[in-house]
């Protein structure tokens, strides 16, 4: 069973850098797992909206220093839920004061090294991040490609698969219908893709483009 990173949710303050027992900033060669993404500035005091990808949204505050996609190390100093959307938070960030500075965070993703997540509690569980780099094979064991990412655009997890031999990556829903078997230890997942999964996009309908 796949799961997303989860820790006991802090209350009120995120405590980054303290709640993680002084965890060091991620190294440049670490295998990274994306935990969230900043959105637009919130108000005038330097707060910013944050979409959390952890199983419990507030748990993103318990991982210590986070690596932003622009290379900076980010410390979340306070978190609170935003109104109306459970996975959207309002965050305060160390060193960010005022709306202009908060706007500079928009669209930056926040990551941690995979080894900071530890192991899932149950033997048959795994993190979606563990799928990255695995071979995608068919029922006969023929390698069809390699999993490069596990994005989620709001409709469920997807496998981004780079076809064997190169070519344009394709997205496959990460459901039992299309992914009947996951073998982390063997380094592969068995997929049952539609025939046109790796087909190049066709020409636009006549009259368009």
Swiss-Prot record:
Keywords: Chaperone, Cytoplasm, Ribosome biogenesis, rRNA processing. One of its GO terms (molecular function) is ribosome binding. The keyword Chaperone applies. GO terms for cellular component: cytoplasm; ribosome. GO terms for biological process: ribosomal small subunit biogenesis; rRNA processing. Its main location: cytoplasm. Residues 123-197 form the PRC barrel domain. It comes from the Bacteria. InterPro entries: PRC_barrel-like_sf, PRC_RimM, RimM, RimM_N, RimM_N_sf, Transl_B-barrel_sf. Residues 1-28 are annotated as: Disordered. It is found in: Cytoplasm. Belongs to the RimM family. Binds ribosomal protein uS19. NCBIfam families: 16S_RimM. The PRC barrel domain binds ribosomal protein uS19. An accessory protein needed during the final step in the assembly of 30S ribosomal subunit, possibly for assembly of the head region. Essential for efficient processing of 16S rRNA. May be needed both before and after RbfA during the maturation of 16S rRNA. It has affinity for free ribosomal 30S subunits but not for 70S ribosomes. This is Ribosome maturation factor RimM. It comes from Methylobacterium sp. (strain 4-46). The lineage of its organism: Bacteria, Pseudomonadati, Pseudomonadota, Alphaproteobacteria, Hyphomicrobiales. The gene is rimM.
């Amino acid at each position: 069973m796949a799961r997303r990173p989860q820790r006991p949710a802090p209350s009120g303050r995120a405590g980054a850098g303290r709640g993680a027992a002084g965890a060091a900033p991620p190294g440049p060669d670490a295998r990274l797992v994306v935990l969230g993404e900043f959105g637009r500035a919130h108000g005038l005091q330097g707060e910013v909206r944050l979409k959390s990808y952890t199983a419990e949204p507030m748990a993103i505050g318990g991982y210590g220093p986070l690596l932003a996609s622009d290379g900076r190390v980010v410390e979340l100093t306070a978190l609170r839920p935003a109104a109306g959307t459970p996975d959207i938070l309002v965050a305060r960030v160390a060193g960010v004061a005022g709306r202009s500075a908060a706007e500079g965070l928009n669209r930056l993703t926040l990551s941690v090294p995979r080894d900071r997540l530890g192991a899932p509690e149950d033997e048959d569980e795994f993190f979606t991040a563990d799928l990255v780099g695995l071979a995608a094979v068919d029922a006969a064991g023929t390698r069809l490609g390699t999993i490069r990412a596990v994005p989620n655009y709001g409709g469920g997890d997807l496998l981004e698969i780079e076809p064997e031999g190169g070519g344009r990556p394709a997205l496959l829903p990460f459901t039992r219908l299309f992914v009947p078997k996951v073998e982390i230890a063997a380094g592969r997942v068995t997929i049952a893709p539609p025939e046109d999964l790796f087909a190049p996009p066709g020409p636009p309908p006549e009259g368009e483009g």
